[in-house]
Design a protein with these regions (language model features):
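Inter-helical turn/loop segments and adjacent helix faces that build the functional surface
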Residues: 13-26, 79-88
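Solvent-exposed loop and edge beta-strand segments that line ligand/cofactor-binding
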Residues: 4, 24-28, 43, 52-70, ...
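Acidic-glycine-rich active-site phosphate/pyrophosphate-binding loop
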Residues: 41-52, 126-130
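Short, small-residue-biased leader/transition segments that mark boundaries at the very start
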Residues: 1-8
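Short glycine/serine- and small hydrophobic-enriched flexible loop segments
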Residues: 8-16, 74-81, 155-162
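CBM-like carbohydrate-recognition segments
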Residues: 64, 80-163
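Long, well-ordered core segments of solenoidal/helical folds
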Residues: 28-47, 92-110
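Charged catalytic carboxylate motif
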Residues: 5, 31-34, 71, 92, ...
């Protein structure tokens, strides 16, 4: 989910900038807030998650995706904690976090925690089939317990408990 990755990037850059880069800091701060505000309009009203292709809600093959939703939750929650976003934005991060847990976090037949709804891989270029089409994005495997989904959820959880 590209929008979530942009939110993380902007928030990470802001955290490392010093006062000597005031104008650059202000520009990236504005981009971060703009990216979050743009993403909010695509947040699923029921679950708080984001669809694999965010502007194609309900298209057959599209699904609520764990890694992007968790990245968004993490970026927003940390952005609020560090003062980069207004406190009212915390509700959007919490909704994405809880929605992901409610929909995809459970216990498997062996009694182990299981996180599902994770896109195994998606990208553009390289192999000829990575053409950016809906068919391509919807054809990528959806997996369980992959680090690309588990790690962002744990990062978001960390922000949930330290605020």
């Amino acid at each position: 989910l590209v929008g979530s990755e942009m939110c993380i990037r902007d928030r990470d850059v802001l955290e490392r900038m010093d006062e000597q880069m005031y104008y650059e800091y202000r520009a990236i701060m504005a981009m971060f807030k703009e990216a979050v505000e743009a993403m909010i309009q695509f947040q699923d009203a029921e679950t708080g998650m984001f669809w694999q292709v965010i502007d194609k809600v309900g298209v057959p093959g599209n699904y609520l995706e764990t890694s992007g939703s968790s990245l968004f939750a993490y970026a927003v929650l940390k952005g609020v904690r560090l003062g980069y976003l207004p406190k009212r934005f915390r509700a959007y991060g919490e909704k994405a976090f809880y929605g992901t847990c409610d929909k995809y976090l459970g216990v498997n037949d062996k009694g182990e925690l299981q996180l599902s709804g994770i896109c195994l891989v998606a990208g553009l270029g390289g192999a000829t089939r990575r053409d950016g089409s809906l068919e391509y994005y919807f054809s990528e495997p959806v997996v369980e317990n992959d680090a690309k989904g588990v790690a962002p959820l744990l990062l978001a959880y960390t922000e949930m408990i330290i605020q």
